């Protein structure tokens, strides 16, 4: 009887340890995705050359086309502004006043975006 209880206890302990280890691995892998984006006011100079997601509204009259596929614009969270440089195809919903999320790196006070995501409201409006 003593041996059965001990074996059952060892099995339960191994199951709990495995479950905690699995949860730990999942949380470690999700670490970069827990905070989807940071507003410009939360970006520090400390985060230079680190992969970031920055979100805000495209500031009015801030879009400058540098080349056919290169653009610069400013995003704001009404506290601080951040200049974004992007090379590539713009998303279809990109415009002034639109909420966007830029994925890239901060370098010399400018954000070098490698990908842009546009945000939209929850109302669906089919094209006419």
From Swiss-Prot:
User: What InterPro entries does the entry give?
Assistant: CcmE, CcmE-like_sf, NA-bd_OB-fold
A GO CC term assigned to this protein in UniProt: plasma membrane
What are the transmembrane regions?
9-29
Q: How does it sit in the membrane?
A: Single-pass type II membrane protein
Q: Name one Pfam family in it.
A: CcmE
Q: Name one GO molecular function term.
A: heme binding
Question: At which positions is heme bound?
Answer: 120, 124
Which compartment or compartments is the protein found in?
Cell inner membrane
Highest taxon above the source species: Bacteria
Q: Which GO terms describe its biological process?
A: cytochrome complex assembly
Provide the alphabetized UniProt keywords: Cell inner membrane, Cell membrane, Cytochrome c-type biogenesis, Heme, Iron, Membrane, Metal-binding, Signal-anchor, Transmembrane, Transmembrane helix
Positions in the Periplasmic compartment: 30-128
Tell me where the signal peptide lies. Answer: none
**Is Lipoprotein a UniProt keyword of this protein?**
no
Topology, Cytoplasmic side: 1-8
What family is this protein classified in? Belongs to the CcmE/CycJ family.
Q: Which HAMAP family match?
A: CcmE (MF_01959)
Function comment: Heme chaperone required for the biogenesis of c-type cytochromes. Transiently binds heme delivered by CcmC and transfers the heme to apo-cytochromes in a process facilitated by CcmF and CcmH.
Protein name per UniProt: Cytochrome c-type biogenesis protein CcmE
């Amino acid at each position: 009887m003593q041996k059965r209880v001990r074996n059952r206890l060892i099995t339960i302990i191994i199951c709990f340890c495995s479950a905690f280890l699995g949860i730990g691995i999942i949380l470690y892998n999700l670490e970069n995705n827990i905070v989807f984006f940071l507003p410009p006011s939360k970006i520090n100079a400390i985060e230079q050359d680190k992969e970031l997601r920055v979100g805000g509204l495209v500031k009015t009259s801030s879009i400058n086309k540098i080349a056919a596929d290169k653009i610069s614009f400013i995003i704001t969270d009404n506290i601080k502004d951040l200049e974004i440089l992007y090379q590539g195809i713009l998303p279809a919903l990109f415009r002034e006043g639109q909420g966007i999320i830029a994925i890239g790196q901060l370098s010399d006070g400018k954000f070098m975006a490698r990908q842009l995501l546009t945000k939209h409201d929850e109302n669906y409006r089919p094209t006419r």
